[in-house]
Amino acid sequence: MNDVIKDEYYDTIATGYEELHREEQEKKLSLIKKHLQVKASDLLLDVGCGTGITSPFNCRVIGIDPAMKLLERNSLLLKVQGEAEHLPFKDNTFDVVISVTAIQNFHDIEKGLQEIKRVGKGKYVLTFLKKSAKRETIVRFIKEIFTIEKEMEEEKDILFFCR
């Protein structure tokens, strides 16, 4: 799916996104929370936050997503329309950066992951669809850019807990 069609796709399905994906995303979120320590004082960035299903952490959260119609359905107080490849934040801003089932949609996977690393302070959770045609590329760049502390597979995704 080319990038323009992909962006339009998420705007088109925005009204039914949660019905399609809520249960699946909440399972991933539960697994992430079991393995990720977050303090109330932490600042967390959710890259590819969509409607905010994966954003409910007990800390300060900012979400970023390119699909405006998904963001309109997101209840986060702080949300930004934007892309992973051009994160509008200073270096080392976020205590935690997560990206749940979004990496396979990045226009430039390497650049998006480099940006995630740049804005984070050292705690990252990265997941992507394990059936993605870009799987080998994504894994290669995650291994080049981050230090992997834990790798897990669940029903549909591969999860990396990194620093």
Q: What spans do the regions from the language model cover?
A:
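Conserved class I S-adenosyl-L-methionine
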Residues: 1-37, 155
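Class I SAM-dependent methyltransferase SAM/SAH-binding core
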Residues: 45-86
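Short catalytic micro-motifs in class I SAM-dependent methyltransferases
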Residues: 101-102
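Short alpha-helix
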Residues: 132-145, 158
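Core SAM-dependent methyltransferase catalytic element
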Residues: 153-163
